[in-house]
């Protein structure tokens, strides 16, 4: 076959395939159920890591009497996420729209992107499987992207992007031999566990409302 004819055939084939390639890479081709499944897997993993690491740290470093005084003191047990308007009970949660719950979940996830790095020494010494600051950070970033995608799908079919939420947790000494640092680490782990529980709960409610047959799982 002549070189010119072969080039023409290749060009024609490329033009025919172009619309298929564009459609195949388009956002709406991913089933909504799969998007929710992926988000829920990450949310559950983060919640489990947060719970296990918190429990492990508490048993290793925090005496019972110190735990009770910490939890009963509003100043030490106050989480930064308290500044993010979130429903405080089941009734309030059910009154929120899907987009409102996703937006709250996104803010909670973004509020931990930097603070989770302060817990580097805690994760490094943890025996909990998968508990490393890099792994937790990657899960947070993946879930952030997943929630933004879900928000875009529920709005107009386009991925939702936005600026990262700025948190105000202050940096502090994470030396494990410093009692003050121990309590601050304990406080961060307490808040991290609490916030990841909220995120998983809110995402499960939105999934139940949006995907048929997904309630109760």
Swiss-Prot record:
Outcome of mutating residue 117 to L: In IGHD1B; reduced secretion
Pfam families in the cross-refs: Hormone_1
Residues noted as binding Zn(2+) in the record, renumbered to the chain: 44, 200
Entry GO MF terms: cytokine activity; growth factor activity; growth hormone activity; growth hormone receptor binding; hormone activity; metal ion binding; prolactin receptor binding
Deamidated asparagine: residues bearing it: 178
Keyword Disulfide bond carried by entry: yes
Effect of residue 134 to R: In IGHD1B; reduced ability to activate the JAK/STAT pathway
InterPro entries tied to this protein: 4_helix_cytokine-like_core (IPR009079), Somatotropin (IPR034975), Somatotropin/Prolactin (IPR001400), Somatotropin_CS (IPR018116)
Compartment(s) where it occurs, according to its Swiss-Prot or TrEMBL record: Secreted
Outcome of swapping residue 42 to C: In IGHD1B; reduced secretion
UniProt KW Disulfide bond keyword: yes
PTM annotation (Phosphoserine): residues: 132, 176
Impact after mutating residue 73 to D: In IGHD1B; reduced ability to activate the JAK/STAT pathway
Outcome when changing residue 67 to R: In IGHD1B; reduced ability to activate the JAK/STAT pathway
Effect of substituting residue 79 to S: In short stature; idiopathic autosomal; affects binding affinity of GH for GHR and the potency of GH to activate the JAK2/STAT5 signaling pathway
Record-level GO BP terms: animal organ development; bone maturation; cell surface receptor signaling pathway via JAK-STAT; cell surface receptor signaling pathway via STAT; cytokine-mediated signaling pathway; growth hormone receptor signaling pathway; growth hormone receptor signaling pathway via JAK-STAT; positive regulation of D-glucose transmembrane transport
Result of altering residue 3 to A: Found in patients with isolated growth hormone deficiency
GO terms for cellular component: endosome lumen; extracellular region; extracellular space; growth hormone receptor complex
Signal peptide stretch: 1-26
Quaternary structure and interacting proteins, as annotated: Monomer, dimer, trimer, tetramer and pentamer, disulfide-linked or non-covalently associated, in homomeric and heteromeric combinations. Can also form a complex either with GHBP or with the alpha2-macroglobulin complex.
Disease: Growth hormone deficiency, isolated, 1A: An autosomal recessive, severe deficiency of growth hormone leading to dwarfism. Patients often develop antibodies to administered growth hormone.
Physiological role: Plays an important role in growth control. Its major role in stimulating body growth is to stimulate the liver and other tissues to secrete IGF1. It stimulates both the differentiation and proliferation of myoblasts. It also stimulates amino acid uptake and protein synthesis in muscle and other tissues.
Additional facts recorded: Circulating GH shows a great heterogeneity due to alternative splicing, differential post-translational modifications of monomeric forms, oligomerization, optional binding to 2 different GH-binding proteins, and potentially proteolytic processing.
Family membership: Belongs to the somatotropin/prolactin family.
Protein name: Somatotropin
Provenance organism: Homo sapiens
Gene of this entry: GH1
């Amino acid at each position: 076959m002549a070189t010119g004819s072969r080039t023409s055939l290749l060009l024609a084939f490329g033009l025919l395939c172009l619309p298929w390639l564009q459609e195949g890479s388009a956002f709406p081709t991913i089933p909504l159920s799969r998007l929710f499944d992926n988000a829920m897997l990450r949310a559950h993993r983060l919640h489990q890591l947060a719970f296990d690491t918190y429990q492990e740290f508490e048993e290793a470093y925090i005496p019972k009497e110190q735990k009770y005084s910490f939890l009963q003191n509003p100043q030490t047990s106050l989480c930064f996420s308290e500044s993010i308007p979130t429903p405080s009970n089941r009734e309030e949660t059910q009154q929120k729209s899907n987009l409102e719950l996703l937006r709250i979940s996104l803010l909670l996830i973004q509020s931990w992107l930097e603070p989770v790095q302060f817990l580097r020494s805690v994760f490094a010494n943890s025996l909990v499987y998968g508990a490393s600051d890099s792994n937790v950070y990657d899960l947070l970033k993946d879930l952030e992207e997943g929630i933004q995608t879900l928000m875009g799908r529920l709005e107009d079919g386009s991925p939702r992007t936005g600026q990262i939420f700025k948190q105000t947790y202050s940096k502090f000494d994470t030396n494990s031999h410093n009692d003050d640092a121990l309590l601050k680490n304990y406080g961060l782990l307490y808040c991290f566990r609490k916030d990841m529980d909220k995120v998983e709960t809110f995402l499960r409610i939105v999934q139940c409302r949006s995907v048929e047959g997904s309630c109760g799982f």
